[in-house]
Amino acid sequence: MGQKILRDGGHLEPSVQQWDWLGHGIYFWEGNPGRAMAWAVQRQKEGKIEAPFVLGAIIDLRHCLDLFDHDGLAQVKQAHRLLMQVSVAAGTKVPRNVGATADRAGRGLDCAVMNTLHQYRKERQELAYDSVRGPFLEGEEIYPGAGFRSENHIQLSVRNAECVKGYFRPLHSKAASF
Protein backbone atom coordinates (compact mmCIF):
# COMPACT_ATOMS: atom_id res chain seq x y z
CA MET A 1 0.00 0.00 0.00
CA GLY A 2 2.76 2.48 0.95
CA GLN A 3 4.72 1.90 -2.23
CA LYS A 4 1.53 2.31 -4.28
CA ILE A 5 0.83 5.68 -2.66
CA LEU A 6 4.40 6.84 -3.32
CA ARG A 7 4.20 5.66 -6.92
CA ASP A 8 0.62 6.59 -7.87
CA GLY A 9 -0.40 9.26 -5.36
CA GLY A 10 -3.57 9.21 -3.32
CA HIS A 11 -4.14 8.89 0.40
CA LEU A 12 -4.24 6.28 3.09
CA GLU A 13 -7.79 5.35 4.04
CA PRO A 14 -9.17 6.40 7.44
CA SER A 15 -9.54 3.63 9.97
CA VAL A 16 -13.06 3.16 11.33
CA GLN A 17 -12.41 0.27 13.71
CA GLN A 18 -14.17 0.11 17.07
CA TRP A 19 -10.80 0.14 18.89
CA ASP A 20 -9.46 3.33 17.27
CA TRP A 21 -8.60 5.00 20.57
CA LEU A 22 -8.28 8.52 19.11
CA GLY A 23 -11.51 8.09 17.14
CA HIS A 24 -11.79 7.39 13.45
CA GLY A 25 -9.06 8.77 11.18
CA ILE A 26 -5.78 8.08 9.40
CA TYR A 27 -3.31 6.88 12.05
CA PHE A 28 0.39 7.80 12.26
CA TRP A 29 3.25 7.49 14.73
CA GLU A 30 4.78 10.93 15.33
CA GLY A 31 8.49 11.01 14.47
CA ASN A 32 9.03 7.33 15.19
CA PRO A 33 9.72 5.31 12.01
CA GLY A 34 11.62 2.69 14.02
CA ARG A 35 8.52 1.91 16.09
CA ALA A 36 6.38 1.89 12.95
CA MET A 37 8.72 -0.65 11.33
CA ALA A 38 8.75 -2.83 14.47
CA TRP A 39 4.94 -2.85 14.36
CA ALA A 40 4.93 -3.71 10.65
CA VAL A 41 7.42 -6.56 11.18
CA GLN A 42 5.19 -7.95 13.96
CA ARG A 43 2.16 -7.77 11.64
CA GLN A 44 4.14 -9.71 9.03
CA LYS A 45 4.97 -12.41 11.61
CA GLU A 46 1.25 -12.65 12.40
CA GLY A 47 0.53 -13.17 8.69
CA LYS A 48 -1.46 -9.92 8.42
CA ILE A 49 0.81 -8.24 5.86
CA GLU A 50 3.28 -9.55 3.29
CA ALA A 51 6.10 -7.02 3.41
CA PRO A 52 6.75 -4.48 6.19
CA PHE A 53 6.93 -0.90 4.94
CA VAL A 54 6.96 2.50 6.63
CA LEU A 55 5.31 5.44 4.93
CA GLY A 56 6.21 8.88 6.27
CA ALA A 57 3.89 11.85 5.96
CA ILE A 58 4.18 15.61 6.12
CA ILE A 59 1.23 16.62 8.27
CA ASP A 60 -0.20 20.02 9.21
CA LEU A 61 -2.26 19.22 12.32
CA ARG A 62 -4.36 22.37 11.83
CA HIS A 63 -7.16 22.45 14.43
CA CYS A 64 -5.82 19.68 16.67
CA LEU A 65 -7.28 18.11 19.79
CA ASP A 66 -4.03 17.68 21.72
CA LEU A 67 -4.26 15.17 24.55
CA PHE A 68 -1.07 16.56 26.09
CA ASP A 69 -3.07 19.74 26.75
CA HIS A 70 -5.18 20.25 29.89
CA ASP A 71 -8.10 21.76 27.95
CA GLY A 72 -8.05 18.92 25.42
CA LEU A 73 -8.26 16.34 28.20
CA ALA A 74 -11.10 18.29 29.84
CA GLN A 75 -13.08 18.07 26.58
CA VAL A 76 -12.53 14.31 26.46
CA LYS A 77 -13.66 13.98 30.08
CA GLN A 78 -16.83 15.93 29.28
CA ALA A 79 -17.47 13.75 26.21
CA HIS A 80 -17.25 10.67 28.46
CA ARG A 81 -19.88 12.15 30.78
CA LEU A 82 -22.11 12.86 27.78
CA LEU A 83 -21.65 9.33 26.41
CA MET A 84 -22.60 7.87 29.80
CA GLN A 85 -25.72 10.07 30.04
CA VAL A 86 -26.85 9.18 26.52
CA SER A 87 -26.21 5.48 27.09
CA VAL A 88 -28.21 5.45 30.34
CA ALA A 89 -31.09 7.35 28.73
CA ALA A 90 -31.13 5.02 25.72
CA GLY A 91 -30.56 1.87 27.78
CA THR A 92 -27.53 0.93 25.69
CA LYS A 93 -24.34 -0.75 26.80
CA VAL A 94 -21.20 1.40 26.90
CA PRO A 95 -18.15 -0.15 25.19
CA ARG A 96 -15.17 -1.06 27.38
CA ASN A 97 -11.43 -0.92 26.95
CA VAL A 98 -10.19 -4.51 26.99
CA GLY A 99 -6.93 -6.38 26.70
CA ALA A 100 -4.50 -8.46 28.67
CA THR A 101 -1.70 -5.87 28.56
CA ALA A 102 -1.37 -2.58 30.46
CA ASP A 103 -2.13 -0.57 27.31
CA ARG A 104 -5.50 -2.36 26.88
CA ALA A 105 -5.22 -2.24 23.11
CA GLY A 106 -8.92 -2.95 22.56
CA ARG A 107 -9.91 0.66 23.18
CA GLY A 108 -13.65 0.52 22.44
CA LEU A 109 -14.57 2.95 25.23
CA ASP A 110 -11.95 5.49 24.18
CA CYS A 111 -13.11 5.26 20.55
CA ALA A 112 -16.75 5.82 21.56
CA VAL A 113 -15.78 8.80 23.75
CA MET A 114 -13.74 10.43 20.98
CA ASN A 115 -16.45 9.89 18.38
CA THR A 116 -19.01 11.32 20.84
CA LEU A 117 -16.82 14.40 21.26
CA HIS A 118 -16.62 14.94 17.49
CA GLN A 119 -20.37 14.35 16.99
CA TYR A 120 -21.24 16.74 19.85
CA ARG A 121 -19.09 19.48 18.29
CA LYS A 122 -20.74 18.87 14.91
CA GLU A 123 -24.25 19.09 16.37
CA ARG A 124 -23.34 22.37 18.10
CA GLN A 125 -21.81 23.65 14.83
CA GLU A 126 -18.43 24.07 16.51
CA LEU A 127 -15.23 23.95 14.51
CA ALA A 128 -14.37 20.32 13.78
CA TYR A 129 -11.02 18.94 14.86
CA ASP A 130 -8.81 18.12 11.90
CA SER A 131 -6.55 15.85 13.95
CA VAL A 132 -6.07 14.29 17.37
CA ARG A 133 -2.67 13.82 19.04
CA GLY A 134 -2.00 11.74 22.12
CA PRO A 135 0.49 9.60 24.07
CA PHE A 136 0.22 5.84 23.75
CA LEU A 137 1.86 4.00 26.64
CA GLU A 138 2.66 0.53 25.41
CA GLY A 139 4.89 -2.42 26.10
CA GLU A 140 6.77 -3.74 29.09
CA GLU A 141 8.54 -1.68 31.77
CA ILE A 142 12.06 -0.93 30.49
CA TYR A 143 13.41 -1.78 33.97
CA PRO A 144 11.72 -2.98 37.19
CA GLY A 145 9.44 -0.28 38.61
CA ALA A 146 9.90 2.02 35.59
CA GLY A 147 7.28 4.49 34.48
CA PHE A 148 8.68 4.12 30.97
CA ARG A 149 7.53 1.37 28.65
CA SER A 150 9.35 -0.27 25.77
CA GLU A 151 6.96 0.82 23.02
CA ASN A 152 5.75 4.29 24.13
CA HIS A 153 4.97 6.63 21.27
CA ILE A 154 2.92 9.61 20.20
CA GLN A 155 0.06 8.74 17.92
CA LEU A 156 -1.88 10.95 15.53
CA SER A 157 -5.32 10.45 14.08
CA VAL A 158 -5.80 12.68 11.05
CA ARG A 159 -9.52 13.26 10.55
CA ASN A 160 -9.16 15.67 7.63
CA ALA A 161 -7.10 14.19 4.77
CA GLU A 162 -6.21 17.73 3.61
CA CYS A 163 -3.87 17.88 6.63
CA VAL A 164 -1.60 15.38 4.87
CA LYS A 165 0.60 17.49 2.60
CA GLY A 166 2.62 14.62 1.18
CA TYR A 167 4.12 11.20 1.72
CA PHE A 168 7.73 9.99 1.71
CA ARG A 169 9.81 6.95 2.55
CA PRO A 170 11.71 7.76 5.77
CA LEU A 171 15.29 6.85 6.53
CA HIS A 172 15.21 4.21 9.26
CA SER A 173 17.29 4.53 12.40
CA LYS A 174 18.06 2.03 15.12
CA ALA A 175 17.86 2.65 18.86
CA ALA A 176 21.07 3.98 20.34
CA SER A 177 23.04 1.66 22.58
CA PHE A 178 25.99 2.19 24.90
What are these regions (language model features)?
Residues 2-3, 7, 11, 54-178:
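Active-site and NAD+-binding cores of ADP-ribose-processing enzymes
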Residues 17-20, 46-48, 144-148:
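A general structural signal for short secondary-structure junctions and capping/turn motifs
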Residues 17-43:
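Extended catalytic/binding region for NAD+/ADP-ribose chemistry, centered on the ART fold
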Residues 23-26, 52-58:
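Extracellular structured ligand-interaction cores
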Residues 29, 35-37, 47, 128, ...:
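Amphipathic alpha-helical interaction segments
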Residues 36-38, 49-51, 66-68:
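Short, solvent-exposed secondary-structure capping/transition elements
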Residues 43-54:
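Cytochrome P450 catalytic domain signature, combining two hallmark sequence patches
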